[in-house]
Amino acid sequence: MGSSKKHRGEKEAAGTTAAAGTGGTTEQPPRHREHKKHKHRSSGGGSSGGERRKRSRERGSERGSGRRGAEAEARSGAHGRERSQAEPSERRVKREKRDDGYEAAASSKASSGDASSLSIEETNKLRAKLGLKPLEVNAVKKEAGTKEEPVAADVINPMALRQREELREKLAAAKEKRLLNQKLGKIKTLGEDDPWLDDTAAWIERSRQLQKEKDLAEKRAKLLEEMDQEFGVSTLVEEEFEQRRQDLYSARDLQGLTVEHAIDSFREGETVVLTLKDKGVLQDGEDVLVNVNMVDKERADKNVELRKKKPDYLPYAEDESVDDLAQQKPRSILAKYDEELEGERPHSFRLEQGGMADGLRERELEEIRTKLRLQAQSLSSVGPRLASEYLSPEEMVTFKKTKRRVKKIRKKEKEVIMRADDLLPLGDQTQDGDFGSRLRGRGRRRVPEVEEEALEDEEKDPVAQPPPSDDTRVENMDISDEEDGGALPPGSPEGLEEDEAELELQKQLEKGRRLRQLQQLQQLRDSGEKVLEIVKKLESRQRGWEEEEDPERKGTIVFNATSEFCRTLGEIPTYGLAGNREEQEELMDFERDEERSANGGSESDGEENIGWSTVNLDEEKQHQDFSASSTTILDEEPIVNRGLAAALLLCQNKGLLETTVQKVARVKAPNKSLPSAVYCIEDKMAIDDKYSRREEYRGFTQDFKEKDGYKPDVKIEYVDETGRKLTPKEAFRQLSHRFHGKGSGKMKTERRMKKLDEEALLKKMSSSDTPLGTVALLQEKQKAQKTPYIVLSGSGKSMNANTITK
């Protein structure tokens, strides 16, 4: 108790050395500080336990009883360990925290050893010989080392590891080669021959042996068949197999099933597994066979097509309007959206007898579609033929009127109050071979048979005429539509059946008859009254510009040398739609001349001045109908100070104002209508225009041989504001900017202008110079310096050969 620390340390070291010298356990003294007396006891207990274990090992090895030795060792080791651990724990002044892992390792190391493990194994062998159950050994893993006695790890040699791996690979390759040789050793090579092929005796022996084996096999088969027939086994087996064969699901049960794939997607010789398509539990319908891989492939192909598909606009695309049974199938308005709204229509076919499908029905349906399609299209066309100027007899049949319709028209004409019994015949213009012209308004036209018969009836049944009138304005009288309505009542069914052209023709014929009747009434006027009327017109013409608006002067024309000369100078022949219509007037003149000749030539000179006149006898076809305004070409100029109307009239006479001929509307008043001749011309042209528009779409029946070598070269060019021709890209950009209402930015515009300037410089440059004229500048510089070269860098003095610098 009263010893110093130095003395206490020497005592502990002596105790540790004594314990180690006695051959006791390798147990280290506790780390905590204990009393000197307890340490000696613990070391003494440890040494006594070691001696007991040594004696028990020797005793067990001598007697051969491992079990008793092991039990004694276990008891002695446990007893010594308890004593060694219990005694120091009773009296401890200061104790540190225990290390459980360290103590367990120390105890296991003390209790286990090579001799004990061998004795347990020998004990188990003896127990096995005696038929007893072997002892269970709880093997405790040895730790690699402790803190006081660490165990060094094995050194890893990479060269040894590599050699070991190479050796393993060589062994595996040798093993694989050996197995391959064993497998291929049974197969004969091409160079090896069977010994019995070359030796005749060996071949005969082998043949006899094979024959014997065949005979034995046949005998065994016959014997087995006889036994089966005797015991009835074969019949039972056949019945059993037949029943199983009938119960099995075979190809005959596949008849009528639908395969939801196109028949072209199955290739010949390829095996495809079809399964039933999934459907809802409550969904009714037949079973459908599908292949999962083909469904995925079709879906992938469709997705690829949808990705690269562009929106198409085909407003005139014609789909097949006939189904498989040659029936008209309904067409949807927007067929391209049917798949999105109603879903995709899958391709399918049905399996036939035996589960086979050859696509015969699909091919038959396709052949029917092809036949129907070919029937609708014919490649045979009518050969070219010469265009006839006149209608053929077959075409004239369509223009003939029935007798019933003719009688009705004649009856309506008889109901007219005023009839022309002195109507001039139009002449024998029709012949059997003349069937009318295709060019309406450009030649003679045939008078319909209805008109001829009506004219004959009117001549046979004359009516008293009203008293004649000497008013020249009757020529300008307009026949209203209400009077024409008397010929054909609007409510009659016959009028509804007639086409528009026939109704217009009948109206014009009726008006023509009445106008001719009024003109014939004018011929019966007294000549004195005509002279007075002419004198009145002359007096009114001399009064001045106020008499210009008199409608009575429209029917008179005055000819003199000056007016004829001015008329010839001012006439400009035009043949367009807005021209003079000289051809139409010539036709009307020709018809009027024939009417005069048929009437006996009783027309007077005064009648010629009413509406028709001949300027030159040599040119009978050049007639001009002048109004009253044409006679005042060289009259006295009106006084301008009378007002604005006088000034405008003066400007109009001098040609300073552009006058446009306006179409006069039809009114009820007789003094506001057009002349009869002009009125008839306009109506005839309206009818002709209607038929000509219809003939525009008939096309030509013969090619223009004069235009065989004509190959038009059409070039569409665009220019900018400066007159420069634009490229297709620039033209498109200009149209796009004009359409969208926005142009390029500032930078793009500047770059484009710079590029245009460079192109202009390239066009202006000389063939021996650059666009900027550098060659010309170089020559000018050389000429100024009088040197055959030019200095690009440095000063001229440094490059001078006469100057020497150091």
UniProtKB/Swiss-Prot annotation:
Keywords: Coiled coil, Isopeptide bond, mRNA processing, mRNA splicing, Nucleus, Phosphoprotein, Spliceosome, Ubl conjugation. There is a cross-link at K141 (Glycyl lysine isopeptide (Lys-Gly) (interchain with G-Cter in SUMO1)). One of its GO terms (biological process) is positive regulation of cytotoxic T cell differentiation. The modification Phosphothreonine is found at T189, T430, T701, T770. Residues 32-42 have a biased composition (Basic residues). Residues 450-460 have a biased composition (Acidic residues). Residues 58-101 have a biased composition (Basic and acidic residues). Plays a role in mRNA splicing as a component of the U4/U6-U5 tri-snRNP, one of the building blocks of the spliceosome. May also bind to DNA. This is U4/U6.U5 tri-snRNP-associated protein 1. The gene is Sart1.
